Amino acid sequence: MATNTITTTKVTTTTTDVTGLSLIAAHSHISGLGLDDNLQPKENAQGMVGQLSARKAAGVILKMVEAGKIAGRAVLIAGPPSTGKTAIAMGLSQSLGNQVPFTALAASEVFSLELSKTEALTQAFRKSIGIKIKEETEIIEGEVVEIQIDRTITGGHKQGKLTIKTTDMETIYELGNKMIEGLTKEKVLAGDVISIDKASGKITKLGRSFTRARDYDAMGPETKFVQCPEGELQKRKEVVHTISLHEIDVINSRQQGFLALFSGDTGEIRPEVRDQINTKVAEWKEEGKAEIVPGVLFIDEVHMLDIECFSFINRALEDEFSPIVIMATNRGVSRIRGTDYKSPHGMPMDLLDRSITIHTTSYTADEIRTILSIRATEEEVELSGDALALLTKIGQETSLRYAANLISVSQQIALKKKNNTVDLQDIKRAYMLFLDSDRSVQYLEENADQYIDDYGRVTIGQESTDGSTQPQAKQQEVAQPEATQPQSQPEDDKMETD
């Protein structure tokens, strides 16, 4: 009697999530300044909450930048920590869009071993100035009727003919090697609508003609159908290229300078090169070939700059090619770096006199609750009502940044318990595990003798005879130079005096 055996094979499928480049950052939820058409700030719009007067002032700056006629102005955003100074600058950047150059720079980035301070600031200034270069090109635009390519037996020189048409006319063009390679690379077939730049020979595939929409053919979802062009085949078209002054500097600073744009190894650029470029750009502007677009340079933590950098900014603001400089600081009356003088916001008085100041104020409890709710939505975390209330209280007593950081930590604690909603206990657990700045300072003061001080000394506890731990001042020196004792001279060298 035969026995049938059934074998079951278990197949395990592993799915790997590929993380994209759009990670959640501190200000990724901000998409603008949250203003209406009359520059009136909304209470909660485009990720911005509160700071109504500061956002309205930033809206005025936005209109100045969009007008493109005013440059060389300095704006200072000053306020306590965690009051949204950087958020206002990011909202301004989002509102300007991609057409206006916006360069964000931390003041500590200026200090480098590869570049001098003035060179780093000069490059940042010139990155914030855009040049719109207008160029008229002749293009051939039409629908491909037929492509005929003749190859020799030896496989050498290729020849071909391209039949192209519009709704009004049809023409046959002779093709050379370069054009045949371009058509093959773009995978141009009969029925495609293409555009050919006569000067450079660049071929652009615009789409597929509507007349071929019903053809039996395999097409991908990205296939775009367009109308067959009308009128003449050869047309003149104005093309606008947008480039920054810094990119022009790098390209002209050395042979194959355009490669340095991708590697980032620009190095020091000679002033003579920049002067020649400024002269040429001024000529293009007078001839109507180019248009200067003053952008925005944002310097965060500006109090970290020293007196030489502030002096350079004073001079650079008076230059012809100068952007609008926005600075942010959270310092009060503090010492100017590089000097022994104290000044408001750690900046020299002459630069403060040139700047218009926007002040930010601390957030209220309702505003903190709204911001934390927006952050939770951005991070895809579901908070219970009690958890949001506790986070709001923590944000009031500590800082908004600390409360926002607890959101993702609390989510991991909740997921460990297989809960999709973060509740009150998860927030408490995260609060006990991770200290805020005040509790960290308190712990440090209570246990200061167990940490190494400025002189490399540390007190280590030693167990006494009765079992208790008694602190013993055992000093461990960390690379401390020993004081040199004067050596005793030999008896013969001593001089006796009567």
From Swiss-Prot:
Subcellular compartments: Nucleus
GO CC terms in record: Ino80 complex; NuA4 histone acetyltransferase complex; R2TP complex; Swr1 complex
Top-level lineage group: Eukaryota
GO biological process annotation, one example: rRNA processing
Signal sequence extent: none
Primary role: DNA helicase which participates in several chromatin remodeling complexes, including the SWR1 and the INO80 complexes. The SWR1 complex mediates the ATP-dependent exchange of histone H2A for the H2A variant HZT1 leading to transcriptional regulation of selected genes by chromatin remodeling. The INO80 complex remodels chromatin by shifting nucleosomes and is involved in DNA repair. Also involved in pre-rRNA processing.
Name of the protein in question: RuvB-like helicase 2
Organism, scientific name: Candida albicans (strain SC5314 / ATCC MYA-2876)
